[in-house]
Design a protein with these regions (language model features):
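PLP-dependent amino-acid enzyme catalytic core
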Residues: 1-166
Length: 166
């Protein structure tokens, strides 16, 4: 992270402005002397704690830009964790309700993190795995036409943000 990035990090009005301002650390003992320079990108420095903050912010802002996510909408998504945390954080900052569908075998701690951002959770049966979680989210979406589902696994904004910023 450059001095300029550090200065920017100290002048932001909300946590979303910090997404992606993650430092690089040179790994000095990974390659032989006079070898390649190897760096690690510390995505854990994102406000929600993972690289998934990038995709959550990107998918929501892309939907806003395209006019399919409007004030008062609810974001719904199937998740196993970090994307859900990112969406819960983005929703909290931007004022959206967030409903996250996850397997019943997800930890209570993970659910508490989501709920601390104001998100609601709906549990799917563990034996159906992620496919069952996605199906349950799609059923809820069909019943609530004002909901928006980012569809992280099919959303072009997901890989695009990595190409642009990671």
């Amino acid at each position: 992270m450059t001095t300029n990035s550090l200065t920017q990090a100290g002048q932001n009005s909300n946590s979303l402005q910090l997404v992606g301002l993650t430092p690089l650390v040179k790994l000095n003992n990974v390659v032989p002397t006079n070898g390649a320079n190897v760096y690690a990108k510390l995505e854990c420095f994102n406000p929600g704690g993972s690289v998934k903050d990038r995709i959550a912010k990107a998918m929501v802002e892309d939907a806003e830009h395209r006019g399919i996510l409007k004030p008062g909408s609810t974001i719904i998504e199937a998740t196993s964790g970090n994307t859900g945390i990112g969406l819960a954080m983005v929703g909290a900052v931007k004022g959206y309700q967030v409903l996250l569908v996850m397997s019943e075998n997800m930890s209570a701690e993970r659910r508490m993190i989501l709920e601390s951002f104001g998100a609601k959770t709906e549990l799917s049966r563990a034996e159906f795995g992620m496919e069952g979680t996605i199906e349950k989210a799609e059923e809820l979406l069909a019943q609530n036409p004002d909901y928006f589902m980012p569809e992280q696994f099919n959303n072009p904004a997901n890989p695009a943000i990595h190409r642009e910023t990671t």
